[in-house]
Amino acid sequence: MSTFKSLSLSALLFIAFLFTCARGATFNIINNCPFTVWAAAVPGGGKRLDRGQNWIINPGAGTKGARVWPRTGCNFDGAGRGKCQTGDCNGLLQCQAFGQPPNTLAEYALNQFNNLDFFDISLVDGFNVAMEFSPTSGGCTRGIKCTADINGQCPNELRAPGGCNNPCTVFKTDQYCCNSGNCGLTNFSKFFKDRCPDAYSYPKDDQTSTFTCPAGTNYKVVFCP
């Protein structure tokens, strides 16, 4: 009987361990902008957020290649079809695919190497709205922000209605898009990096732009922090 109890306890502890390791995350997406933002998430969909409103999503454990982004200048009909000036995702309120540049990105992958979450802010698709991406639990305290006036200071070559394009979107060359995997900092990517040093400014900008927290951490994404 004692052996059976010991095995049962071990099994329960193992199940609890697996549950802890496999836990997803809660993301609180908050709009602090003085204008309406149509938040988008893949996975997750989309939601209109007026000033001060928030939206909760709960991506599952192991989610990767995921992102949250703000859309601006949107109009949707009662069926959730329409168009956005920035960040549009095939004309849908409930996004099923990534948005069109320019849009500021909060990217993440949960429960990855060493059971860590990886997260970043990326300007590889350009910039439309200032953003904060921060952990809110788990003892992880290193948040990241991109709050510079990038739209106002955007180089003429990169200007777009409602935002500032990344040079890859405009020029579509290997120098800026890193299609061959061999690229580095350029004057245009330096423009973004100087203003938002924690954010990705070009596709290979990994060393200074990727951050980690223990799996099971919860997060907030704030527009106009």
Curated annotation (Swiss-Prot):
<dbReference type="InterPro" id="IPR037176">
    <property type="entry name" value="Osmotin/thaumatin-like_sf"/>
</dbReference>
<dbReference type="GO" id="GO:0031640">
    <property type="term" value="P:killing of cells of another organism"/>
</dbReference>
<keyword id="KW-1015">Disulfide bond</keyword>
<dbReference type="GO" id="GO:0050832">
    <property type="term" value="P:defense response to fungus"/>
</dbReference>
<dbReference type="GO" id="GO:0005576">
    <property type="term" value="C:extracellular region"/>
</dbReference>
<keyword id="KW-0611">Plant defense</keyword>
<keyword id="KW-0929">Antimicrobial</keyword>
<dbReference type="InterPro" id="IPR017949">
    <property type="entry name" value="Thaumatin_CS"/>
</dbReference>
<feature type="disulfide bond">
    <location>
        <begin position="178"/>
        <end position="183"/>
    </location>
</feature>
<protein>
    <recommendedName>
        <fullName>Thaumatin-like protein</fullName>
    </recommendedName>
</protein>
<feature type="glycosylation site" description="N-linked (GlcNAc...) asparagine">
    <location>
        <position position="187"/>
    </location>
</feature>
<feature type="disulfide bond">
    <location>
        <begin position="154"/>
        <end position="164"/>
    </location>
</feature>
<feature type="disulfide bond">
    <location>
        <begin position="89"/>
        <end position="95"/>
    </location>
</feature>
<keyword id="KW-0732">Signal</keyword>
<comment type="similarity">
    <text>Belongs to the thaumatin family.</text>
</comment>
<feature type="disulfide bond">
    <location>
        <begin position="140"/>
        <end position="213"/>
    </location>
</feature>
<keyword id="KW-0568">Pathogenesis-related protein</keyword>
<dbReference type="InterPro" id="IPR001938">
    <property type="entry name" value="Thaumatin"/>
</dbReference>
<feature type="disulfide bond">
    <location>
        <begin position="168"/>
        <end position="177"/>
    </location>
</feature>
<feature type="disulfide bond">
    <location>
        <begin position="74"/>
        <end position="84"/>
    </location>
</feature>
<feature type="disulfide bond">
    <location>
        <begin position="146"/>
        <end position="196"/>
    </location>
</feature>
<keyword id="KW-0964">Secreted</keyword>
<comment type="function">
    <text>Has antifungal activity.</text>
</comment>
<feature type="disulfide bond">
    <location>
        <begin position="33"/>
        <end position="224"/>
    </location>
</feature>
<keyword id="KW-0325">Glycoprotein</keyword>
<dbReference type="Pfam" id="PF00314">
    <property type="entry name" value="Thaumatin"/>
</dbReference>
<keyword id="KW-0020">Allergen</keyword>
<feature type="signal peptide">
    <location>
        <begin position="1"/>
        <end position="24"/>
    </location>
</feature>
<keyword id="KW-0295">Fungicide</keyword>
